[in-house]
Regions:
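PAPS-dependent sulfotransferase catalytic domain
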Residues: 88-212, 226-229, 233
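Short, well-ordered beta-strand elements within core beta-sheets of diverse protein domains
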Residues: 6-8, 185-190, 246
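PAPS-dependent sulfotransferases, especially Golgi type II membrane carbohydrate sulfotransferases
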Residues: 1-5, 174-175, 203-272
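PAPS-dependent sulfotransferase catalytic core
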Residues: 1-74, 80, 224
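Short active-site oxyanion
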Residues: 4-5, 84-85, 110
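Generic structural marker for isolated residues within well-ordered, non-membrane alpha-helices
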Residues: 19, 97, 198, 254, ...
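Alpha-helix-centered segments that form part of catalytic cores
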Residues: 64-86, 155-170
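Short, solvent-exposed loop/helix junctions and linker helices
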Residues: 12, 191-192, 251
């Protein structure tokens, strides 16, 4: 079976950029946003709820179901690419640590999580909303005034998938004290010091290092952004990004994000 790694990064924090940098390595197939985790969760839900499984020998069904999960993942990834390593990108992997460990006989999965100053992540979402007026944001309802202001959108994003859910996954990782099993990357450090960050990542993945070209990043992850609210286009050159949150959100909204997620800012050493 191929080696599979999992990119479970925070939304609007550079996960697509990271995929395309790593895709420069000829041994790595980096996916666009993937539904593989969703397939596993759907199978898990069916297995847990259906009487056809519950009524049979528990030990036998457990063995068979584990084989189904592993075999399904193997078949899926083998048909994606002939390359040695698969880097599958989904926000949902952040909540799948224990499932993946269960599937592979106690072996800890290699999960990468890119994080960013939350004010900048939220500002990126708000910017996408404002500057894509041709798209109808699916949750906005003019009749009920749902999500018709920045304040309402902030509160919605904070408790919804994928942004709020990924933050919950991150918080649970620290609560469960498994943060040392996850490779966290600060987006700001990745942009400013990409080579040492990548060397640390390769060391975590336990694969041979590849010298990347951070000045000429080709976008090879191909997906139809018409199915998503936000686009996934990347910059060709990796360099620090100027902060925009204060200009886009204003001080009140920035303070709201900090106050409600102070634990995050402290865990990852982001200043007020």
């Amino acid at each position: 079976m191929k080696k599979i790694f999992y990119n479970a990064s925070l939304p609007r924090s550079g996960s697509t950029l990271l995929q395309n940098v790593l895709a420069q390595n000829p041994d790595i197939y980096a996916t666009p946003t993937s539904g593989l985790s969703t397939l596993l969760q759907s199978a898990k839900e069916t297995y847990s709820k259906r009487a056809e499984f519950a009524a049979l020998d528990t030990a036998l069904m457990k063995k068979a179901f584990l084989g189904f999960l592993r075999g399904g993942m193997e078949g899926f990834t083998n048909n994606l690419s002939d390359k040695k390593y698969i880097l599958d990108k989904s926000f949902n992997w952040g909540g799948d640590y224990y499932l993946l460990k269960y599937m592979f006989n106690g072996e800890s999965p290699k999960i990468i999580m890119m994080v960013r100053d939350l004010r900048e992540s939220v500002a990126s979402m708000e910017s996408q909303y404002r500057f894509s007026p041709q798209h109808v944001y699916p949750k906005i309802d003019l009749e009920t005034t749902q999500l018709t202001t920045l304040e309402k959108r902030l509160k919605y994003w904070a408790v919804s998938n994928p942004f709020g859910l990924t933050l919950d996954f991150i918080k649970e990782i620290f609560t469960a004290k498994i943060e040392n099993e996850i490779f966290f990357i600060k987006f700001e450090e990745f942009c400013a010091f990409p080579e040492p960050v990548m060397k640390g990542l390769y060391n975590y993945l336990e694969i041979p290092y590849f010298a990347h070209d951070f000045d000429n990043i080709e976008q090879v992850t191909d997906q139809n952004d018409g199915f998503y609210i936000f686009n996934h286009k990347i910059r060709k050159q990796l360099k620090p990004v100027e902060p925009k949150a204060l200009d886009i959100l204003g001080p009140e909204a920035c303070n709201w994000v900090y106050t409600n997620y102070e634990w995050f800012f402290k865990k990852f050493n982001y200043a007020l």
